[in-house]
């Protein structure tokens, strides 16, 4: 008998396939053919025909669940470098007494790249194929994602120096930087989607948030923000503006 076309790079056989189709069908003992990094077919198993696919590698998934890649919808991926630094603390204490000080001291393009590559490797190892990120030096993170071949929504991080003293010049600077970032990664296709990330209502003024949100809307880009995370945040925003977040 002849083989079935060009050889496969990988053939996955056995196990149970969770399709995530509208009916959430589960297939028993499927055959999944992969060539050049793409799934080219999914079929019901026919054991006598497996050899016809001539795969370079065969993965026996017996006893396993085969499913589409996981999606991590909220990351600041280089912060893997701060793992274990300060755990189980109230948010504002964690940020102001621990995270913000070490970010000011250690965060640069080199540490962001190292942390991004480590965090991405851990995500891939655990089955995550897409993540949505927001941080400093986001172009460095986007480049690391492209290098690793993982799908990324990359949000350029925006903070005000002092939300009580934001000037029109500072807001114009935010918008120009945002437009430059979106333009740089506009050709990312489905694997790299540029976004804008205002950190939070307690680190970005309403004027900054509105201007950045409008920039995202104008470019058709996602807009990301932390909001209403804790009761303390509600108290902070109520004190500042007389309204909840």
Predicted regions and their residues:
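N-terminal metal-binding scaffold of metallo-dependent hydrolase/deaminase domains
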Residues: 1-52
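Short coil/turn connectors at secondary-structure junctions
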Residues: 6-8, 54-56, 62, 126, ...
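Divalent metal-coordination and catalytic microenvironments
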Residues: 15, 32, 37, 63, ...
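Conserved protein kinase catalytic core
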Residues: 20, 68, 78-80, 205, ...
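Short, glycine/acidic-enriched loop or turn micro-motifs at the edges of active sites
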Residues: 75-77, 136, 229
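Alpha-helical scaffold segments that flank or form the walls of functional sites
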Residues: 83-150, 174-188
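Metal-coordinating catalytic core of metallo-dependent amide/deamination hydrolases
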Residues: 141-245
